[in-house]
């Protein structure tokens, strides 16, 4: 049984807890969020506008959440180094704040007594692992990143295509649901002027490091992929459009067959496959990292193709966070 603590009880933190509670070998013993009280944590965990009401029992007493009879301590500490992770016997701290995402800042959890840290965001200094893609390279590192939701969608698809047909170069666009960093009405956003515009009424071009990050988890693709994002007014589920120039001539049917085989084989549960006439809401709550939409892609020539793959950027990603926690604990 791996004892975990969740730092940051936002969209990802709460879904990670829902998923962790369903795993027999993961025990959530504590959460920390300086911005919410225990009664509010109970409310936010119980009610979810996107994924629905939690099916079990949610109570609180003192500074403790009681979920399905299980007690989980709630802390409100701004500095992770001050948390009692040693005293609580924390094996892995899951940092889902989006703040402590580099080795030096995530180290605070280690200083507090946690044995390992899993960061739920891309990191420029911590090693990144994408389940189904490069997790076998994990060699006991103390602090690791689960990369981003978009990298988790793109990397399994890129891996299959590169292994079967070779990727010469490619461009990715993610059409991405809005997130908490965006504004309900036009507001100040000095680092990203467009990002400060009304989220619910605009298609907003944005940057993303997700495609370049694939080169970190699949070194053979380093420098071969880059990408951008469009933020759109949907609450959850996003879609990757990967346009690639291949090394080897092929047909679209051969590409579909290769992806279908991977989805039923070594990437089962990570990479999904559908030929149905689907739309974004059909993937709410889907725990795959990436679901290839066979009927949405197009091919211009035997080496030039556009591939489309969906992902629940909240639920699918949070599922992978818990998978990585289990993998780190076992290795």
Swiss-Prot record:
**Which residues are involved in binding D-glyceraldehyde 3-phosphate?**
148-150, 179, 208-209, 231
User: InterPro entries from the xrefs?
Assistant: GlycerAld/Erythrose_P_DH, GlycerAld_3-P_DH_AS, GlycerAld_3-P_DH_cat, GlycerAld_3-P_DH_NAD(P)-bd, Glyceraldehyde-3-P_DH_1, NAD(P)-bd_dom_sf
Q: Name one GO biological process term.
A: glycolytic process
Pathway it works in: Carbohydrate degradation; glycolysis; pyruvate from D-glyceraldehyde 3-phosphate: step 1/5
State one molecular function term (GO). glyceraldehyde-3-phosphate dehydrogenase (NAD+) (phosphorylating) activity
Q: Which residues bear the site annotation Activates thiol group during catalysis?
A: 176
Active site (UniProt)? 149
Return the EC number.
1.2.1.12
Give Gene Ontology CC terms.
cytosol; external encapsulating structure
The reply to whether Iron-sulfur figures as a keyword in the UniProt entry is: no
Keywords linked to the UniProt accession = Cytoplasm, Glycolysis, NAD, Oxidoreductase
Q: What class of enzyme is it?
A: oxidoreductase
| Subunit field text | Homotetramer.
Q: What is this protein called?
A: Glyceraldehyde-3-phosphate dehydrogenase
Species of provenance: Eremothecium gossypii (strain ATCC 10895 / CBS 109.51 / FGSC 9923 / NRRL Y-1056)
Gene expressing this chain? GPD
């Amino acid at each position: 049984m791996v004892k975990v603590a969740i730092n940051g009880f936002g969209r990802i933190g709460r879904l990670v807890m829902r998923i962790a509670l369903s795993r027999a070998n993961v025990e959530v013993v504590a959460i920390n969020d300086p911005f919410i009280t225990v009664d509010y944590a109970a409310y936010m965990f119980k009610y979810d506008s996107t994924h629905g009401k939690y099916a079990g029992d949610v109570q609180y007493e003192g500074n403790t959440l009681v979920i399905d009879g299980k007690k989980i301590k709630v802390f409100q500490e701004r500095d992770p180094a001050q948390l009692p992770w040693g005293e609580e016997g924390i094996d892995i701290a899951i940092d889902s704040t989006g703040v402590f995402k580099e080795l030096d800042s995530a180290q605070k959890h280690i200083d507090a007594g946690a044995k390992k840290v899993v960061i739920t965001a891309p990191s420029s200094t911590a090693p990144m692992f994408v389940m189904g893609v490069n997790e076998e390279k994990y060699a006991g590192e103390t602090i690791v990143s689960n990369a981003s939701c978009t990298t988790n969608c793109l990397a399994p698809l890129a891996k299959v295509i590169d292994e079967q047909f070779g990727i010469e170069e490619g461009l990715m666009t993610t059409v991405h649901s809005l997130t908490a960093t965006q504004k309900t009405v036009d507001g100040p956003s000095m680092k990203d002027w467009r990002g400060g515009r009304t989220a619910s009424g605009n298609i907003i071009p944005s940057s993303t490091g997700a495609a370049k990050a694939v080169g970190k988890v699949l070194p053979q693709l380093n420098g071969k992929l880059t990408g951008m994002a469009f933020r759109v007014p949907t609450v959850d589920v996003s879609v990757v459009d990967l346009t690639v120039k291949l090394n080897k001539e092929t047909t679209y049917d051969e590409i579909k067959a290769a992806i279908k085989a991977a989805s039923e084989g070594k990437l089962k549960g990570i990479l999904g496959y559908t030929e149905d006439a689907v739309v974004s809401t059909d993937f709410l709550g889907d725990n795959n990292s990436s679901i290839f939409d066979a009927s949405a892609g197009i091919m211009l020539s035997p080496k030039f193709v556009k591939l489309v793959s969906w992902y629940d950027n909240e639920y699918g990603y949070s599922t992978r966070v818990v998978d990585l926690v289990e993998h780190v604990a076992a290795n």
